[in-house]
Amino acid sequence: MFYIDNDSGVTVMPPVSAQRSAIVRWFSEGDGNNVITWPGMDWFNIVQAELLNTLEEAGIQPDKTKLNQLALSIKAIMSNNALLIKNNLSEIKTAGASAQRTARENLDIYDASLNKKGLVQLTSATDSPSETLAATAKAVKIAMDNANARLAKDRNGADIPNKPLFIQNLGLQETVNRARNAVQKNGDTLSGGLTFENDSILAWIRNTDWAKIGFKNDADSDTDSYMWFETGDNGNEYFKWRSKQSTTTKDLMNLKWDALSVLVNAIVNGEVISKSANGLRIAYGNYGFFIRNDGSNTYFMLTNSGDNMGTYNGLRPLWINNATGAVSMGRGLNVSGDTLSDRFAINSSNGMWIQMRDNNAIFGKNIVNTDSAQALLRQNHADRKFMIGGLGNKQFGIYMINNSRTANGTDGQAYMDNNGNWLCGAQVIPGNYANFDSRYVRDVRLGTQSLTGGLSRDYKAPSGHVITGFHTNGDWEMQGGDDKVYIRPVQKNINGTWYNVASA
């Protein structure tokens, strides 16, 4: 076997072209309507590759001078991987004990056991505990001779000459005595109590599951004595409390590995204590509510919608500082009834004038309608009420309304209107008049009188003065300098000081 070795060949096998037909075809010399078959490059390359791979599998190098290499390759492959008739399966023996056992089991020939028939070794021993050896007829005879010298099984003890002595020799006398009053295993009725004086337990076992009741008590001085209940196997067993009335059964409580479910109302006279950070939970509808204590604060928490048994969401409606007891709210508070507080403070903020519109402050949530009155703060008295509030888009101030009033209106008010004017429905009575005295005229008078003369026909009193009288020597011709007038200044009193007024 050899490959193409002239210059017409290539060194790399060309890719095999796609299959043209699924029909098996054969060579033809062109007889009849058939053309002469042309195998083509693919067919020769495939045949050469198959032959060369066969030699490679057998470990034989192609030799152009030898014409039996294909036969030698097939023979070598068979010798390496096949059992030869002439060797009588010696190849398996040579492979070792494990290979021999595997070969037997492949033929369904096993070593004999209690559960499977198969090959077994014989023994004549009568004292062997082995369960893999088979007894010979000799061993069986020895055992039968021994048995014949003993009590016959088919006599069921009838051949025992002294049965009471036999029971006594077996130490069964006390057992027989107890059996007379024993509880039957298939059911019985007790007229008295059942007492366990040791660590015995009461157990129910079904399949691989069990339920047990026991009592732990190491000594009379044991301070950790308790009665225990246990179910077990794969963790799916649990305790169930239920009640039955007539034909109706009602589940009351389930206790599983990780949770106690109370299915009816629970009335607790003592404390309900949770040592988990998350305590009481109410899971109803889409949302869950629970109380959480993280060590520093105690929170009222909510879950996301649709996850009422899940963890808490980002809302913090209310929390209590564990150290100070201070209550904080993170989502606002709506109160329909009265609210009582010793002190009330606003977390105020600073800013520019225009920002006062949005600062934290006490404010009415609803805008005051035009021409409608709204009180923001109110103080109740025995016969009247005082309010801070206003009239929509018109006024804001302090108002008083008597309890006896039936018609709309107020009984007293002092307010600022929408133009910035401050109006008071009655007198403004200051507690200190100093501010008023320094600004307003308290009194007006005529000042000290003086005489001025030399009147002319166009005389005018000095600025801020008035004429109070005339003086003449007899004739009043208002010339010559002998006619005169008396004048006094007009004065005003401001804050205790007299000032002369000026003319316009």
UniProtKB/Swiss-Prot annotation:
<comment type="function">
    <text>Component of the tail fiber that acts as a receptor binding protein. Binds to the primary receptor, thereby determining the host range. Two alternate tail fiber S and S' proteins are encoded extending the host range of the virus.</text>
</comment>
<dbReference type="GO" id="GO:0098671">
    <property type="term" value="P:adhesion receptor-mediated virion attachment to host cell"/>
</dbReference>
<dbReference type="Pfam" id="PF21446">
    <property type="entry name" value="Gp34_trimer"/>
</dbReference>
<dbReference type="GO" id="GO:0098678">
    <property type="term" value="P:viral tropism switching"/>
</dbReference>
<keyword id="KW-1035">Host cytoplasm</keyword>
<keyword id="KW-1227">Viral tail protein</keyword>
<keyword id="KW-1161">Viral attachment to host cell</keyword>
<dbReference type="InterPro" id="IPR005068">
    <property type="entry name" value="Phage_lambda_Stf-r2"/>
</dbReference>
<keyword id="KW-0426">Late protein</keyword>
<dbReference type="GO" id="GO:0030430">
    <property type="term" value="C:host cell cytoplasm"/>
</dbReference>
<keyword id="KW-0946">Virion</keyword>
<keyword id="KW-1160">Virus entry into host cell</keyword>
<dbReference type="InterPro" id="IPR051934">
    <property type="entry name" value="Phage_Tail_Fiber_Structural"/>
</dbReference>
<comment type="similarity">
    <text>Belongs to the caudovirales tail fiber protein family.</text>
</comment>
<keyword id="KW-1230">Viral tail fiber protein</keyword>
<dbReference type="GO" id="GO:0098024">
    <property type="term" value="C:virus tail, fiber"/>
</dbReference>
<keyword id="KW-1233">Viral attachment to host adhesion receptor</keyword>
<dbReference type="GO" id="GO:0046718">
    <property type="term" value="P:symbiont entry into host cell"/>
</dbReference>
<protein>
    <recommendedName>
        <fullName>Tail fiber protein S</fullName>
    </recommendedName>
</protein>
<dbReference type="InterPro" id="IPR048390">
    <property type="entry name" value="Gp34_trimer"/>
</dbReference>
<keyword id="KW-0945">Host-virus interaction</keyword>
<dbReference type="Pfam" id="PF03406">
    <property type="entry name" value="Phage_fiber_2"/>
</dbReference>
<keyword id="KW-1264">Viral receptor tropism switching</keyword>
